[in-house]
């Protein structure tokens, strides 16, 4: 799919692009990562991020695919967020952003090209 707006949104504007965690005891950090393949052209860029309980604000470190001049660049990047120990239910949302409004970024979303995951010690 393509996206051409300078607004952070949930990936593909689809509510299902989320990962839910439930913690009953505040002992472990939750390491989340979001990996995605994207294509940008003509001095455009794309950003992916993780939003903890948000579809419009990023948490942690975002990842960028930036094409500095004309041409095309295709790359897989990974965003990270380390969530501190806490109790309750949290949603970690995959987010996307187009750096230069009006120019399209192509995001790919099959299981081979997009993965949102969480890890913690057991």
Give the predicted meaning of each segment.
Residues 29-87, 95-122:
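Terminal beta-strand-rich extracellular "head" domains
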Residues 1-24:
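Solvent-exposed, flexible loop/coil segments flanking beta-strands in beta-rich domains
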């Amino acid at each position: 799919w393509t996206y051409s707006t300078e607004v952070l949104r949930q990936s593909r504007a689809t509510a299902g692009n989320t990962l839910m965690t439930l913690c009953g005891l505040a002992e472990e950090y939750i390491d989340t990562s979001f990996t995605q393949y994207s294509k940008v052209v003509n001095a455009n860029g794309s950003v992916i991020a993780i939003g903890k309980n948000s579809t419009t604000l990023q948490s942690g470190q975002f990842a960028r695919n930036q094409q500095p001049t004309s041409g095309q660049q295709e790359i897989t990047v990974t965003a990270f967020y380390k969530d501190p120990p806490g109790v309750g239910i949290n949603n970690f949302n995959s987010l996307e952003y187009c750096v230069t409004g009006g120019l399209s970024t192509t995001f790919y979303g099959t299981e081979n090209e997009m993965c949102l995951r969480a890890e913690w010690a057991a």
